[in-house]
């Protein structure tokens, strides 16, 4: 249900861009390319890949825990991201697998291992494999949306993402209902409904920057932002289950260093 709410909100937010004449022109241009078969329809399925990630997250986090989920997801994103950049699948400039980028990928993964909570209990391989595919789905979402951006613009790409994702999530919920799974639980907290707005920002930024930054750098920067924000929130709103200690701070610092390495700054 959270995924559906997020996609509805994102669709509404991104629909506002259609009031801009330039966005409508770009959308018509893309439609023309599709009609001429100069742009394959499957490249519009970035939102479906995003829905795969959301559905996998909602069904595996409670089984393997947030810590292990995050580590496996980030590792999968990093490996797939560096390969996508290598072969230029996002329609951006190809980026060689240099020792610096490889080191950044490894540091980024290690940083997440440091900052997440320790995993306790039996390792369940089926959910872990599912999370690996979820990481691949996130990379695929960024890649496909970047390809749409190349032939239109980031607003059109982000707008297409949400209806596609909403369709996939709705279909998943219908199937769950057929198998007797109850999903009709609406959140009580009003602020949870802001997820669609925040998701729209992330998808838009990804569509606008991935072709330039590359999938690896965008992924590392996104995780770095999440880690820093989570530390700030944990300090401002302390949680008994979370300890902002040396490991978490050092891990966040390592992640920022990984972003620096991947950015090729001198």
Q: Locations of the language-model features?
A:
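Glycine-/small-residue-enriched transmembrane alpha-helix faces in small-molecule transporters
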Residues: 1, 52, 56, 103, ...
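Structural signature of hydrophobic alpha-helical transmembrane segments
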Residues: 1-12, 59-79, 123-137, 184-199, ...
């Amino acid at each position: 249900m959270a995924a559906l709410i997020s996609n509805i909100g994102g669709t509404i937010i991104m629909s506002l861009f259609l009031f801009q004449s330039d966005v409508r022109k770009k959308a018509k241009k893309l439609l023309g390319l599709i009609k001429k078969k100069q742009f394959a329809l499957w490249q519009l399925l970035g939102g479906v890949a995003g829905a795969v990630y959301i559905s996998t997250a909602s069904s595996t986090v409670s089984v393997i825990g947030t810590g292990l989920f995050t580590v496996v997801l980030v590792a999968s994103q990093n490996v797939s991201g560096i390969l996508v950049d290598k072969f230029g699948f996002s329609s951006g400039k190809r980026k060689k697998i240099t020792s610096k980028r490889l080191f950044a990928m490894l540091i980024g993964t290690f940083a997440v291992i440091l900052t997440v909570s320790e995993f306790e209990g039996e390792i369940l391989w089926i959910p872990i494999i599912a999370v690996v595919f979820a990481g691949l789905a996130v990379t695929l979402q960024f890649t496909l949306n970047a390809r749409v951006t190349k032939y239109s613009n980031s607003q059109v790409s982000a707008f297409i993402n949400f209806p596609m994702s909403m369709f996939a999530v709705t279909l998943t919920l219908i199937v769950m209902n057929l198998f007797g799974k109850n999903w009709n639980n609406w959140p009580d907290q009003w602020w949870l409904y802001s997820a669609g707005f925040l998701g729209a920002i992330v998808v838009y930024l990804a569509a606008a920057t991935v072709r330039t930054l590359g999938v690896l750098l965008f992924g590392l920067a996104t995780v770095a932002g999440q880690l820093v924000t989570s530390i700030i929130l944990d300090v401002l709103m302390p949680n008994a289950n979370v300890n902002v200690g040396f490991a978490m701070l050092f891990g966040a610092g390592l992640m920022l260093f990984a972003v620096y390495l991947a950015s090729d700054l001198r």
